Amino acid sequence: MNYDTSVFKKNLHELNIDLSDNQVNQFLTYYEMLIDKNKVMNLTAITDFDEVVEKHFIDSLALIKIINLDQQLSILDLGTGAGFPGIPLKIAFPKLKVILADSLNKRLVFLDEVISSLDLKNISTVHGRAEDLARMNLYRENFDLCVSRAVANLSTLSEYCIPFVKVGGQFISYKSAECNKEVDNARHAISLLGGKVKEIQKFEIGDSGRAFVSILKEKSSPKKYPRKAGVPSKMPL
């Protein structure tokens, strides 16, 4: 099927991202696989091509606004869902080493199919809850960067994500532009976990106000965090 990629390329140009024809085709294949699988599995409420481009692909890639992604960073995408932002980041920035984590295995089966179809390297999936994975030596404090577009309170997200990050690394949360109060309410939790709010960068994609909340990991997270499965969401720090 032919797609009008003019809006996609315009948005890429505004982010100073230059993709090869092969990379653009990888995005198109990803879109087709997403829409096809969405017929039998709830992956996205957005299915129109230009909307998926803007609200999923470009929103994911906008991370370039706050960090240089053209380098060999190890990235954990926690609560990846349909693969955002991890797969768009991997397509556009092949040097990245990416792990996609989710608690729902059938999503990861789909993402493994995408990874195989797009012939992506140095990207894999892991099934489990953040509270359990963060206690495993294989993952704890092992990533340069943890990212999440998951819809959750920042205090809860911080308890999920910060323990995965190396000291000196960052946790970056994708939020709406109206996040200042949420960030202020999360500062205590962030500090307990060894982090510090480094930057809040606001921007617009189409008619949506968006923000990146960048949290720098200054010291090792206490071993008692994250707490047992279910506790961080029910009783935020």
What spans do the regions from the language model cover?
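Residue-level signal for inorganic ion chemistry
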Residues: L34, L89, K175, I215
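Conserved SAM/SAH cofactor-binding pocket of Class I
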Residues: L61-A150, S158
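SAM/dcSAM-binding transferase cores
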Residues: D184-L237
